């Protein structure tokens, strides 16, 4: 096992194997996860990757240090579904000339993105390091970060894309190993899964990089006329902008393997001339509701907001931390049956854990057994077995209760005690400042992460008079 792996093993969809995770640069671990397309409130299926990769983000920060992990999760705010929603919701105002389509689109995307942020915060998820919006990366940028138009130009120049019938398409036949992620070769490609077959395509599987916009539709000037990007090129640009041409981990739902992630790989590798886009590809399993596929036609389609704020599921609303635990009780790669019974089980389990954790006045050390379990391809079920054992051993003020409290905080559950050991925090801050002065960043980061696991958020600054580094803290709720 490489020292750089820190004992972490992850299942890689690309290789269909679980192997040691070795970052490209242990001081700059990089992860990209596909975020929401903001045309409608996120549904409970969307919640699963957000929660799963939040746990991985927390684990990576613990293993490599908070300052050494970059997590990018995008917002897709240009899409034909958004256009359709804007016309549906604001059609009369647009027809009356009171609102342009672009203004209506902005209202839809802002409202939906704001709700998404409220939802995921209630689910106990940390904010990603960066959250780029697709519309900010269409045209060449003043800061020189990757953009969609430049990537498309590179693909054309390298012989991997062509213009036809007002579109620019990726030539799948130009990439000999296209289909590597989904294990589909070109002979097996069938139309469907958001890949349209048209007469102007060289190959049935060729997909759109750029398409023309009507005068009313959102559009940007390009060498191929005023238009807008295809679905896949957006993530290739945003990941390259913040993580580089090759990075460590790319995540998302199982439904994105084909065509979205397959086409991301094709675009990025061919535009940059690299052998990979990301070294590890991770995908969470599908979600059913009460044993059936979630579908509006079946009447079992629920948004995160509905579960949190209304009584439409099980005749009651549900706390965000209950939804979080219910999602994590099943291994992320396995399918999950989301049911009232599962939520009730999660709520009862969480109640028992919290009751035991309350026996400790403050969080203790994070048990190595919890980290070991999570380091085995995010085996949350094994980590929860440790928590249940600690709950059984917990007594007033003992180590088991303190370790349980630390574990719950680390996993994103709010059990921070108001009774913080202030002297202990002060000593830890002093030690950290000494380590920073000695340029021992790794140990300084570890102290910060351990305090955060105990519910203590550090804030670094400078004394306005002396200019010396100072650190304040607050209880993170």
UniProtKB/Swiss-Prot annotation:
Subcellular location: Cytoplasm
GO terms, biological process: cysteinyl-tRNA aminoacylation
Cofactor note: Binds 1 zinc ion per subunit.
GO molecular function: ATP binding; cysteine-tRNA ligase activity; zinc ion binding
Pfam families noted in UniProt: tRNA-synt_1e
Principal subcellular localisation of the protein: cytoplasm
Primary enzyme class: ligase
Keywords from the UniProt entry: Aminoacyl-tRNA synthetase, ATP-binding, Cytoplasm, Ligase, Metal-binding, Nucleotide-binding, Protein biosynthesis, Zinc
Positions with a binding annotation for ATP: 296
E.C. number: 6.1.1.16
GO cellular component terms attached to this protein's record: cytosol
Residues noted as binding Zn(2+) in the record, renumbered to the chain: 34, 235, 260, 264
Reaction it catalyzes: tRNA(Cys) + L-cysteine + ATP = L-cysteinyl-tRNA(Cys) + AMP + diphosphate
Family label: Belongs to the class-I aminoacyl-tRNA synthetase family.
Protein name per Swiss-Prot or TrEMBL: Cysteine--tRNA ligase
Upper taxonomic lineage: Bacteria, Pseudomonadati, Pseudomonadota, Alphaproteobacteria, Hyphomicrobiales
């Amino acid at each position: 096992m490489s020292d750089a792996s820190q004992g972490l093993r992850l299942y890689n969809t690309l290789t269909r194997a679980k192997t040691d995770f070795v970052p490209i640069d242990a001081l700059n671990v990089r992860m990209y996860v596909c975020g929401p397309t903001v045309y409608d409130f996120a549904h409970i299926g969307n919640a699963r990757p957000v929660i799963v990769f939040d746990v991985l983000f927390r684990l990576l920060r613990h293993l490599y240090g908070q300052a050494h992990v970059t997590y990018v999760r995008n917002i897709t705010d240009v899409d034909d579904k958004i256009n359709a929603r804007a016309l549906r919701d604001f059609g009369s105002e647009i027809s009356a000339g009171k609102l342009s389509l672009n203004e209506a689109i902005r209202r839809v995307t802002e409202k939906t993105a704001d709700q998404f942020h409220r939802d995921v915060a209630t689910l106990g998820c940390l904010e990603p390091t960066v959250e780029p919006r697709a519309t900010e990366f269409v045209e060449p940028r003043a800061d020189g970060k990757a953009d969609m138009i430049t990537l498309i130009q590179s693909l054309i120049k390298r012989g991997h894309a062509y213009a036809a019938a007002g579109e620019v398409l990726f030539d799948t036949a130009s990439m000999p190993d296209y289909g590597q992620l989904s294990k589909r070769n070109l002979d097996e490609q069938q139309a469907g899964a958001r890949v349209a077959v048209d007469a102007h395509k060289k190959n049935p599987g060729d997909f759109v990089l750029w398409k023309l916009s009507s005068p009313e539709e959102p559009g940007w000037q390009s060498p191929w006329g005023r238009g807008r990007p295809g679905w896949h090129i957006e993530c290739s640009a945003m990941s390259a902008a913040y993580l580089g041409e090759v990075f460590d981990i790319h995540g998302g739902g199982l439904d994105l393997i084909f065509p979205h992630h397959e086409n991301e790989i094709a675009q990025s590798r061919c535009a940059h001339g690299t052998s990979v886009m990301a070294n590890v590809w991770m995908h969470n399993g599908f979600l059913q509701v009460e044993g059936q596929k979630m579908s509006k036609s079946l009447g079992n389609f629920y948004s995160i907001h509905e579960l949190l704020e209304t009584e439409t599921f099980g005749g009651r609303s549900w706390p965000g931390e209950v939804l979080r635990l219910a999602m994590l009780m099943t291994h992320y790669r396995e399918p999950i049956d989301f049911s009232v019974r599962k939520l009730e089980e999660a709520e009862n389990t969480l109640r028992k854990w919290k009751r035991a954790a309350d026996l400790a006045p403050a969080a203790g050390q994070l048990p190595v057994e919890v980290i070991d379990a999570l380091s085995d391809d995010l085996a949350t079920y094994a980590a929860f077995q440790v928590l249940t054992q600690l709950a059984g051993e917990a007594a007033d003020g003992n180590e088991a209760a303190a370790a349980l409290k630390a574990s719950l905080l680390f996993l994103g559950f709010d059990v921070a005690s108001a009774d913080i050991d202030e002297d202990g925090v002060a000593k830890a801050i002093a030690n950290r400042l000494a380590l920073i002065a000695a340029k021992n960043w790794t140990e300084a980061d570890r102290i910060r992460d351990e305090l955060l696991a105990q519910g203590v958020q550090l804030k670094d600054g400078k004394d306005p008079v002396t200019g010396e580094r100072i650190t304040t803290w607050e209880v993170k709720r």
